Amino acid sequence: MLDVKLLRTQFQEVKEKLLQRGDDLANIDRFEQLDKERRRLIAQVEELKSKRNEVSQQIAVLKREKKDAESLIAEMREVGDRIKQMDEQIRQLEEELDSLLLSIPNVPHESVPVGQSEEDNVEVRRWGEPRSFSFEPKPHWDIADQLGLLDFERAAKVAGSRFVFYKGLGARLERALINFMLDIHLDEFGYQEVLPPYLVNRASMIGTGQLPKFAEDAFHLDNEDYFLIPTAEVPVTNLHRDEILTADDLPLYYAAYSACFRAEAGSAGRDTRGLIRQHQFNKVELVKFVKPEDSYDELEKLTHQAETILQRLGLPYRVVALCTGDLGFSAAKTYDIEVWLPSYGTYREISSCSNFEAFQARRANIRFRREPKAKPEYVHTLNGSGLAIGRTVAAILENYQQEDGSVVIPGALRPYMGNRDVIR
């Protein structure tokens, strides 16, 4: 959520920044209109209350002097009724303003490249060289089917499309990757592990920015008003909702494995085969709470930490800075890490690392004090995938496939796979 003071004092600058996103400006224009009306009404109410206080004193004097005060009393009843009506108008305006604030996206950081779509994203760096095959590389779903690692057909029978059964060494590979990623983030980068709830309440979804904008992409339990989490970002960020932390608490680093659930409402016809786009998938998520002045250094660290996983696995990737038109609703700046998938002949997103500045903290009321009696300030929050597990499985199967249909297990992963070096 944006700072109301920023909207009032730098309205045109904010509007221009949001225009760079390609955002519909109707909400911010409506906000300005309603905010002016609210402040006008508040000024009128204060004026009426001041008048009421003055006249009340006059009435008191008239009563002490045994003089007739009925006309003034009647006038003040009318003033009281007007104040009551205007207070109700103000309350309704404030409700609408609060709703509008929740629907206005974050302002892009000045370093974010300006553009309209993913075509305008800017490549920052590459690591590793895509492998040259002496045979036609197969897509990961064909490799997995031949090795008995994944079963999409039976998952469709049991649940529907965009679900999968991991079987045998496929299930072990998934579990190995979860443990491998967590061990690196905990032991080398100092994250604290949390295992979050998979169901969250509405306030949590609002806090991280999933609601109200992305309601159609969420799985909602109507009878309890719970939501299945689309990412561990939601419960872990809300871990400190409505709290005031101390300066000594920061930075806070959390690493969380969870299943993630997404309706993929806008993805009809896209990535219909394989592990790239599922309704349910596993992910290791990294979440940071930091002081505002540290957040952009922390974004660089976060991105490098996610990259480390791909480097240890020997998977070629690139890092791109998202342009303003491709930036997520809550993010001020985002780097996507894209892994090379031979069957696609291109790089595909495997991690998204974002700095939200105070946008989520303001929605979730997460603050800190620099000194014991100092005024609370909003923390900055960051998160990133460290990594998406299913897409990592896909990348390993495709990049390490052999002509005979087997798959070599990356060296760093072998201790987690019973010291196997190949899947046959």
Swiss-Prot record:
Using the UniProt record, name the top-level EC class of this enzyme in a single word: ligase
Listed PROSITE patterns: AA_TRNA_LIGASE_II (PS50862)
Question: Which positions make up the signal peptide?
Answer: none
Superkingdom field: Bacteria
Cite the EC number: 6.1.1.11
Per the record, what are the reactions this protein catalyses? tRNA(Ser) + L-serine + ATP = L-seryl-tRNA(Ser) + AMP + diphosphate + H(+); tRNA(Sec) + L-serine + ATP = L-seryl-tRNA(Sec) + AMP + diphosphate + H(+)
Q: Where in the cell is it found?
A: Cytoplasm
| Residues involved in ATP binding | R262, A263, E264, E349, I350, S351, S352
Query: Which Gene Ontology CC terms are recorded?
Result: cytoplasm
Gene3D superfamilies xrefs: Bira Bifunctional Protein, Domain 2, Serine-tRNA synthetase, tRNA binding domain
Q: What pathway is it annotated to?
A: Aminoacyl-tRNA biosynthesis; selenocysteinyl-tRNA(Sec) biosynthesis; L-seryl-tRNA(Sec) from L-serine and tRNA(Sec): step 1/1
What UniProt keywords are attached to this protein's entry?
A: Aminoacyl-tRNA synthetase, ATP-binding, Cytoplasm, Ligase, Nucleotide-binding, Protein biosynthesis
Q: Name one GO molecular function term.
A: serine-tRNA ligase activity
The Gene Ontology biological process terms listed for this entry are: selenocysteine biosynthetic process; seryl-tRNA aminoacylation
Name the residues that bind L-serine. Answer: T231, A232, E233, E285, S385
Entry-linked Pfam families:
Seryl_tRNA_N, tRNA-synt_2b
PANTHER family (UniProt xref): SERINE--TRNA LIGASE, SERYL-TRNA SYNTHETASE
Q: Belongs to which family? A: Belongs to the class-II aminoacyl-tRNA synthetase family. Type-1 seryl-tRNA synthetase subfamily.
How are the domains described in the entry?
Answer: Consists of two distinct domains, a catalytic core and a N-terminal extension that is involved in tRNA binding.
Quaternary structure and partners: Homodimer. The tRNA molecule binds across the dimer.
User: What's its job?
Assistant: Catalyzes the attachment of serine to tRNA(Ser). Is also able to aminoacylate tRNA(Sec) with serine, to form the misacylated tRNA L-seryl-tRNA(Sec), which will be further converted into selenocysteinyl-tRNA(Sec).
User: What is the name attached to this protein's record?
Assistant: Serine--tRNA ligase
The protein's organism comes out as: Geobacillus thermodenitrificans (strain NG80-2)
List the gene name.
serS
